[in-house]
């Protein structure tokens, strides 16, 4: 039984997307009472064209933020940058920024990939 499982794991290739930086930092914005960070998302999946960004607390509950694109189209093997603004009163609550693949086709693998980066304290 275990041999079959190990074999399947070895032959299966898991493609996900990438997000950088690993430990983003908030910086002051030119707008009053807002802080800003930027993350880059790289699409490694040919079955996914859209990605959603989100900011979360330590319990993975969403925190309100502002970005030009919450959901953004990213072609296969391309990058996109998300600029995220947050009210500075939430700075201590925001622990993670995550990107999640958005499935749009029935022929896709059916697997949603979600990658989170942790904010440095």
Predicted features along the sequence, with ranges:
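Hydrophobic residues positioned within well-ordered beta-strands of beta-sheet architectures
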Residues: 37, 51, 80-82, 95-97
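Short, solvent-exposed loop/turn segments enriched in Ser/Thr/Gly
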Residues: 22, 31-38, 92-96
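Sec-dependent N-terminal signal peptides
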Residues: 3-13
